[in-house]
């Protein structure tokens, strides 16, 4: 009896971009040895819209809506990064009430983002009930968006110098009512997943990232804290009124998908805590900087005097000029450190606005995180990275 040596070749498989579990228009090429993934190569650029170039032809105020559409799940965090960069170049001081409103809605955005990320991640594993439960609560958060801006998603609410308008009557009461009942909703989600045997089998020790790997790849947010690195810009480099608030920063130990799940659950609890602190500490006062070149007057005041009409007309047509230096401003967005490198040449349009997108850094870890796992695990690894293609491709 003779034996023959046969060389087994790996084969490649396309995952996405049309696959519903690809979390957007993303494509990955998987090199597989049987049912084991040997290599996963993300192919980006399918949702590239030229955002950074388009902004160079807009005024600083007209550039704001592009921030909403860059990462369309946590919109106000991107608005805040752009507005803060402009304010830093202008050396503009934002009123205290506006700072509290900004923090309030950024934490509402964080809850909205995590509730979507966690429950779509659960659907990747095979659990559909948490998704339906969470969307009932997320609908309330989008209604809060709508009440302050008129839009459910692309709000353009956080603007250079402050916020677009003050909180409508009764909104703070409704937000407080939401915080009182949302903790029990988180408990229900945990009851479905945290101790579930199948859930833990699919998540524990899968997609592991060490602390050094997370630093080398430029991870931030939950992806960094899940690997045991306690780094949160709200604590490490406080902005707005974060130095007056007192949340806890959850940190993982193993760096696997289960740790990142637990951190997102706890971050929703801490966001509720921050929202309650903002509601209790928020003072009365102005919600825009007292600079009519930067912040136009309200429409009601515009009809009372010629000066108000002029001050309302100029910012929306010509815009305002920003001094020539450059600045880098970063905020702790729900997905990680979202940064804006803004270069001004002294005109009313940015010379360059470079976006530091956390999802772009996280996507490069897909190969290492997927190695020697099954194709079904690749789906959930993309889910635990919480990637949005619009932010990756810009």
Curated annotation (Swiss-Prot):
It is found in: Mitochondrion. One of its GO terms (biological process) is mitochondrial electron transport, NADH to ubiquinone. Pfam families: Complex1_49kDa (PF00346). It comes from the Eukaryota. Its main location: mitochondrion. SUPFAM superfamilies: HydB/Nqo4-like (SSF56762). Residues 1-16 have a biased composition (Polar residues). InterPro entries: NADH_Q_OxRdtase_suD, NDH1_su_D/H, NiFe-Hase_large. It catalyses: a ubiquinone + NADH + 5 H(+)(in) = a ubiquinol + NAD(+) + 4 H(+)(out). GO terms for cellular component: mitochondrion. Keywords: Electron transport, Mitochondrion, NAD, Oxidoreductase, Respiratory chain, Translocase, Transport, Ubiquinone. Its EC number is 7.1.1.2. One of its GO terms (molecular function) is quinone binding. Residues 1-22 are annotated as: Disordered. HAMAP family: NDH1_NuoD. Belongs to the complex I 49 kDa subunit family. PANTHER family: NADH DEHYDROGENASE [UBIQUINONE] IRON-SULFUR PROTEIN 2, MITOCHONDRIAL (PTHR11993:SF10), NADH-UBIQUINONE OXIDOREDUCTASE 49 KDA SUBUNIT (PTHR11993). NCBIfam families: NuoD, PRK06075.1. Core subunit of the mitochondrial membrane respiratory chain NADH dehydrogenase (Complex I) that is believed to belong to the minimal assembly required for catalysis. Complex I functions in the transfer of electrons from NADH to the respiratory chain. The immediate electron acceptor for the enzyme is believed to be ubiquinone. Component of the iron-sulfur (IP) fragment of the enzyme. Complex I is composed of about 45 different subunits. This is a component of the iron-sulfur (IP) fragment of the enzyme. This is NADH dehydrogenase [ubiquinone] iron-sulfur protein 2.
């Amino acid at each position: 009896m003779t034996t023959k040596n046969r060389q087994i070749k790996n084969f490649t498989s396309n995952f996405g971009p049309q696959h519903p579990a690809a979390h957007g228009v993303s494509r990955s090429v998987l090199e597989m040895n049987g049912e084991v993934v040997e290599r996963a190569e993300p192919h980006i650029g399918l949702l590239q819209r030229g955002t950074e170039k388009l902004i160079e032809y807009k005024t600083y105020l007209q550039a704001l809506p592009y921030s909403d559409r860059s990462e369309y799940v946590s919109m106000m965090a991107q608005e805040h990064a752009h507005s803060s960069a402009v304010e830093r170049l202008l050396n503009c001081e934002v009123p205290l009430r506006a700072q509290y409103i900004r923090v309030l809605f950024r934490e509402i955005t964080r809850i909205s983002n995590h509730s979507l990320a966690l429950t779509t991640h659960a659907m990747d594993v095979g659990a559909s009930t948490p998704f339906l439960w969470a969307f009932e609560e997320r609908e309330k958060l989008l209604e809060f968006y709508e009440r302050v801006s008129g839009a459910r998603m692309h709000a353009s609410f956080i603007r250079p110098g402050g916020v677009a308008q003050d909180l409508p009557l009764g909104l703070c009461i409704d937000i407080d009512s939401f915080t009182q009942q949302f903790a029990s909703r988180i408990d229900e989600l945990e009851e479905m997943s945290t101790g579930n045997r199948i859930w833990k089998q699919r998540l524990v020790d899968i997609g592991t990232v060490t602390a050094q790997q997370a630093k080398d790849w430029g991870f931030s947010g939950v992806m960094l804290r899940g690997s045991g690195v306690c780094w949160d810009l709200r604590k490490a480099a406080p902005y707005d009124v974060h130095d007056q608030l007192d949340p806890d920063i959850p940190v993982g130990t193993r760096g696997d998908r289960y740790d990142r799940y637990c951190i997102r659950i706890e971050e929703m609890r801490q966001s509720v805590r921050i929202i309650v602190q903002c509601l209790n500490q928020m003072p009365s006062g102005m919600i825009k900087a007292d600079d009519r070149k930067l912040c136009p007057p309200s429409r009601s005041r515009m009809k009372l005097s010629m000066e108000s009409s002029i001050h309302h007309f100029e910012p929306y047509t010509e815009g305002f000029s920003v001094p020539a230096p450059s600045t880098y401003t970063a905020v702790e967005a729900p997905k990680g450190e979202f940064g804006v490198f803004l270069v001004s040449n002294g005109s009313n349009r940015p010379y360059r606005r470079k976006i530091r997108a956390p999802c772009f850094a996280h996507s490069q870890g897909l190969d290492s995180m997927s190695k020697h796992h099954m194709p079904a695990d690749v789906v959930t690894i993309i889910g635990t990275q919480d990637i949005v293609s619009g932010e990756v491709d810009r």
